[in-house]
Amino acid sequence: LIGELNGTDLRYIREMSGCDANGKETGGCLSVLDLSGVNIVDGGNTYYGNYSASDNKIGDYTFYKCARLTRVIIPDNLLSIGEGAFGCCYNLSSVVIPDKVRDIGELAFYRCESLGVVSIGCDVNTIGVYAFRSCISLKEAIFVDGNKPLQVGDNLFYNCPLEKLYVGRNLKFENFSFGKIKTLM
């Protein structure tokens, strides 16, 4: 995709990805979503429930329950990923969070049960509570080297079999439990 996407566009993408604006399953079969050439903008209709699009943000619950998605390429100009944005995308196995993203909301990737590795960009400074809760295949997390402290919500990797955590040399975690991580690098 290339160009601007508003709430109406996101609604159609949801339907093509297996879930409509009311949370009901659709026959959509879109599995790979490349948003690298996209600017998300205000406007259009609501995309899910009463949620509407905002500039440079994958808003709250944007792709919630879009179970057909397996891979998403996030725009490089994105600043924020909202609460539950990819929640219950059970088949999502690949996502790279670009460097410009500053905030990742609570439960943003809740129950992305096929997600095995996540890479988090260097400008992220806040990650909400339970952001990766119940990502039951998540074995590796990479925090790209950044210059700022990182505020991490409690139980970031709750119910995840995380084995390796790669941490850039300038990162400082606040309110973070390392749980059962086997390798810290």
Located regions from the model:
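Short, T/G/N/S-enriched strand-turn elements that build extracellular solenoid repeat scaffolds
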Residues: T8-G18, G84, A141, D154-N155, ...
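Intrinsically disordered, low-complexity boundary segments flanking structured domains
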Residues: I13-G23, E106, G128-Y130, V152-D154
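Short, solvent-exposed loop/turn and secondary-structure capping segments
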Residues: Y12, N45-T46, F132
